[in-house]
């Protein structure tokens, strides 16, 4: 289900996307601003500033920030410092969107991921939907989607041999090979010294630092690394899904990842034929997650029960838990990983 965004929220998403791109440039050893370029700043950041400038002049009769550089500096102080109206979208408006000068905050990353996932933003077709369209266009088996996504999730730094092996084992992937290449970029020569996580491909000192099994440093030089959208939109969200699939499969149950072109994250089939549908969710903003889930649903894949499942470590944060519970109004039950496993065990008795 496509999430509905207000114009104000789209502005904030563009801002966050632009800030993330600037931080990524810095972390890759590139200039944050391309001084001699026609467009020195990331396009989403430029668009956010342009639209905010109109808003400020109409509302305040003056510019709140005279330049993009000033706006970026404000983002290092707090969300409220950038624009007070943005406070409604975040859990902690008095905290910065850029931490330690060069790292996007967890909430900033969370909103930035929507730029690549949402069709509503400037008709920007999401990578995942383009993959689905290509699979339908070439009449490929639906399992192609699962194979493709799993490869990316498990291979943040694939070698040429890894990709050749994938194509040899699954020749149907050849039809969507260009999209596979699009998920990666050439790694900088200093990739092994950049503080990249070998699990997700993101930066070690980043918003993924609390993700289970993440933040293990990359120790060898690599040829390819995932683009930042791949990290946020494909790899990190898949960590909980792959983790759950492994545990449930070891319990002797049939588990299907991303069934029927991602109608759910997990389809669990019990020995008696009963089916549960799981949509696994991680978040950087409890406010944003609640708003998303209030609009979300899990389509029919033959299930008798549906659950939204979140990582255990998220629910250990009582403040996040309180924020989420106060804002979630949906009908689908939201439970933790460990609670899901507990219920599966009970169902098997």
Give, region by region, the residue ranges found by the protein language model.
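Active-site beta-strand-loop-beta-strand hairpin of nuclease catalytic cores
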Residues: 15-19, 55, 267-277
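Acidic-basic catalytic patches of nuclease active cores, encompassing PD-(D/E)XK
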Residues: 190, 218-260
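Catalytic cores of nucleic-acid endonucleases
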Residues: 84, 281-330
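C-terminal helix of von Willebrand factor
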Residues: 333-349
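C-terminal structural cap/anchor segments
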Residues: 259-265, 278
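Conserved beta-strand segments of alpha/beta enzyme cores
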Residues: 254, 331-333
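Nuclease-adjacent, charged terminal/linker segments that flank catalytic cores
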Residues: 2-221, 227
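Generic recognition of long tandem-repeat/solenoid scaffolds
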Residues: 209-213, 246, 266-268
């Amino acid at each position: 289900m496509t999430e509905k965004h207000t114009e104000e929220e789209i502005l904030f998403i563009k801002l966050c996307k632009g800030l993330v791109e600037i931080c990524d440039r810095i972390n890759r050893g590139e200039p944050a601003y391309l001084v001699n370029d026609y467009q020195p700043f990331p396009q989403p950041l430029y668009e956010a500033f342009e639209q905010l400038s109109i808003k400020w002049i109409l509302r305040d009769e003056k510019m709140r920030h005279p330049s993009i550089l000033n706006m970026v500096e404000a983002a290092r102080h707090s969300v409220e410092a950038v624009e007070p109206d943005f406070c409604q979208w975040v859990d902690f408006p008095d905290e910065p969107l850029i931490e330690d000068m060069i790292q996007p905050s967890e909430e900033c990353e969370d909103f930035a991921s929507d730029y690549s996932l949402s069709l509503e933003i400037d008709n920007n077709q999401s990578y995942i939907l383009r993959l689905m369209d290509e699979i339908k266009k070439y009449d490929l088996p639906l399992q192609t989607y699962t194979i493709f996504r799993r490869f990316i999730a498990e291979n943040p730094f694939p070698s040429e041999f890894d990709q050749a092996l994938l194509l040899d084992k699954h020749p149907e992937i050849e039809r969507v090979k260009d999209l596979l290449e699009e998920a990666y970029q050439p790694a900088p020569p200093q990739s092994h010294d950049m503080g990249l996580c070998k699990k997700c491909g993101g930066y070690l000192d980043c918003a993924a630092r609390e993700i289970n099994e993440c933040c293990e440093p990359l120790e060898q030089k690599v040829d390819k690394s995932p683009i930042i959208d791949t990290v946020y939109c494909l790899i990190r969200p898949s960590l909980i899904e792959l983790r759950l699939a492994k545990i449930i499969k070891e319990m002797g149950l049939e588990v299907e990842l991303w069934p029927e072109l991602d109608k759910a994250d997990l389809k669990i089939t019990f020995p008696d034929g009963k089916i549960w549908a799981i949509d696994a969710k991680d978040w950087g903003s409890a406010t944003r997650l609640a708003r998303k889930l209030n609009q979300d649903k899990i389509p029919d894949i033959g299930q008798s029960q549906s659950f939204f499942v979140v990582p255990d470590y998220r629910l250990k944060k009582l403040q996040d838990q309180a924020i989420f519970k106060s804002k979630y109004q949906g009908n689908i039950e939201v439970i933790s990983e460990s609670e899901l496993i507990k219920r599966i065990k009970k169902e098997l008795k």
